[in-house]
Design a protein with these regions (language model features):
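Fe(II)/2-oxoglutarate oxygenase catalytic core
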Residues: 2-260, 264-320
Length: 320
């Protein structure tokens, strides 16, 4: 494997760094079931670059996609509440405006936040439909020391009480949505079929790198220990730092593309700029650990049991 400047690491892989704070393209690998050396190299590269992109993986189907995921960790079930009968992957399909067009880290309303997500393009619109990722590690590192110290002691409530009526829907999709709202209503009902609430530290320690990162996103309902207006102000200070353009990378999808991101160190946003065209993506997530604060305290479950969704996969955390 060759890193940014061509240093040999493992097999024929080559890593091309795409921006200063986040993102790399990995060439020279056919995804599927991997040997241990290649899998370890990809996991190591993921921890370094936060999000990896693989081109030319047209051969992948759900089975080989799952085999690739198994090479890198322990796959979760598709989702804690959404049902995908007979499938081990989560099918993300546009439904006249539905989509993850808000900044978020995947599934933070449970205690065992996934380690990583692996997303594959299945059907793409003729224009638009890109995805943007942001480094929550870079965001923390850029904070002035007084704000780092403040964030280090804060906790936030995350839950899945997401208001689908407030989705930011492209006006081009409104007519289709109004004509057939059943898809959104069914999706929302499934999403809310079980209530999950977890208290997470605003700053978590990465269990492999020891880096500190901001754990926020659209599943945060409030910062604990302060009033509503203070919570909103604190959230905006830290969330806005995450989404500075210098901390982001935007990927324009092609068929055959696969993206893999470290869910412990990133947020992402699926850009809803493709009108009423179809967009289908398949995702598999890998089991992760329970976040740990800079003081060594684990996240706390308030409501919901995620044991059927995922095991806990906990490498030993260390404080940076």
């Amino acid at each position: 494997m060759k890193d940014v400047k061509g240093t040999a690491m493992s097999s024929d892989l080559r890593v091309v760094k795409l921006s200063e704070n986040i993102g790399a393209r990995v060439d020279g690998v056919r995804l599927g079931e991997l040997d241990a050396e290649t899998a370890a190299a990809i996991n190591q590269t993921l921890a370094q670059h936060k999000v990896l992109f693989f081109r030319g993986q047209d051969h992948l189907d759900d089975e080989s996609h799952f085999a690739f995921a198994e090479s890198l960790g322990v796959p979760t079930t598709p989702h804690p509440t959404l049902k995908f009968e007979g499938s081990r992957v989560m099918r993300l399909e546009s439904f006249a405006g539905g989509g993850a067009n808000q900044w978020h880290t995947d599934v933070t309303f449970v205690d065992r936040i996934p380690k990583a997500s692996i997303l594959r393009a299945v059907e793409l619109p003729s224009y638009g439909g890109s995805t943007t990722w942001a480094s929550t590690v870079a965001a923390y590192q850029q904070l002035p020391e007084p704000l780092q110290q403040l964030a280090d002691g804060l906790w936030a409530m995350h839950n899945n009480a997401f208001d689908y009526a407030q989705m930011d829907i492209d006006p081009a999709k409104l007519a289709a949505l109004q004509a057939n709202p059943d898809a959104v209503l069914k999706y929302a009902a499934e999403f809310h079929s079980a209530h999950f609430e977890t208290h997470h530290p605003v700053v978590r320690v990465h269990p492999e790198t020891g880096e500190r990162s901001l754990l926020l996103g659209n599943f945060v309902k409030r910062i604990l220990g302060v009033n509503s207006s203070e919570s909103q102000a604190l959230f905006r200070i830290f969330q806005d730092r995450i989404t500075w353009l210098e901390n982001t990378i935007r990927w324009n999808w092609e068929l055959g593309d696969v993206a893999m991101w470290d869910n412990r160190a990133t947020q992402h946003y699926a850009v809803s700029d493709y009108g009423s065209q179809p967009r289908r993506m398949h995702r598999i997530t890998l089991a992760g650990d329970i976040p740990v604060s800079v003081r060594g305290e684990q996240s706390r479950v308030i409501s919901g049991d995620a044991t059927e969704y995922s095991v806990i996969d906990s490498p030993t955390a260390r404080v940076a």
